[in-house]
Amino acid sequence: MNQPPNRDRRSQKYLGSKGLILLIALLSAFVPLSTDLYLPALPGMGDYFGVSANLTNLTLILFFLFFSLGLLFWGPLSDKYGRRPVLLAGLALYIAASAGCALSWEIWHLIAFRVLQAVGGSAASAVATAMVKDVYDGRRRESVLALVQSMVVISPAVAPVLGAFMLPYTSWRGLFVALALIGTVSMAGGLLLEETIPSRYTGTMKQSVRRLGTVLRNPGFTSLLIVFSLVSTASLAFVSASPYIYQEGFGLSEQWYSLYFALNAAALIAGPFLYLWLSRHFSRRMIVGSGFAVMIASGALVCLFGSLGPLLFALALFPASLMGSAVRPPGAFLMLDQQKEDTGSASALINCSSLVFGSAGMILIYLGGESLVLGLGAINVAVGVVCLAGWTVIGRRGLTKI
């Protein structure tokens, strides 16, 4: 596979440059949109089906698991057959599965359709990150990644609020209808998309999948992959536990929960912009290292003061959310920069690893005892310590240019 150097030169006849960025941002947001929109309804769904919270949470956990596995399938496939056909096939499955979720009459039917929804939606994320590498170079790529990330994290802020305010007028089924409509809008954008891949992999499909191993054998890529994927352990632990912390722990309504959730999500929105501003004055190495240190301090504050009330909890977690989001653009840039070829495979591994570590966080948060607040604080401290240590080792050993 021989890809020429990327240039910011791949015009889109129908979408245009701004339309392409908007489409990439929407595709990248499929994970938070597919999970956060129905978070306010999660406790009520357990009551509707007459099942425990653990079983209801399988609709989240298995979604992340199969989303991550789907990435490993769609990523190499897009290197061989192109981004556009893979995107359209995945979106068709996502739309059909979303409709199936809305029509589910038993919890196991819902879980099955969520698995199919995850597999279809994973094509969107795999293709989105790869298209950034296809089209943009250097500083422009880093800026686009930051812009896309900032737009992506708007969805965790908007989705729970939208979901909470939809619930008085519809049931949880209506939220999955909304996801089907989002998939339809994305499909329209995909139909207008012109192929972005510079050159396609010419080997067999089996050889294409094996390129995942080739990418993982790059020590610079793999070391960065582990460090930056760990951040998702803390962020998705919060996503999983937040409705139970705010609604059952602090006794808030669905609407108040969505507003407090949006406060933390505002930090996610600001993070990439903060990084772009800081990158004009400080080195990437210093910004990322400081971000991990802030996560440690913020996690400690959550442990000390988070149980005293919803506002103190949200404010204590705010710095961790802010800096966890701020380190995402440089992390994605550095990981993509390690691979001159196999962009689809690298993109798949980046997103897959993030979701695998995130799914682990969604499980760990319920294994730490009765206090979800203390558990979340401890996870942030642990993640910050490990990431800071790993980042320091990467810098000292010169595994990659940071």
Where are these regions (language model features)?
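A late C-terminal transmembrane helix in Major Facilitator Superfamily
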Residues: 336-370, 380
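Paired small-residue
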Residues: 93-100, 108-116, 311-319
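Helix-loop-helix hairpin linking two adjacent transmembrane segments in secondary transporters
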Residues: 109, 138, 146-191
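Conserved MFS/SLC helix-loop-helix module at the cytosolic interface between two early adjacent transmembrane helices
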Residues: 69-108
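Cytoplasmic helix-loop-helix junction between adjacent transmembrane helices
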Residues: 113-154
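Juxtamembrane intracellular "pre-TM" segments in multi-pass secondary transporters
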Residues: 5-14, 196-224
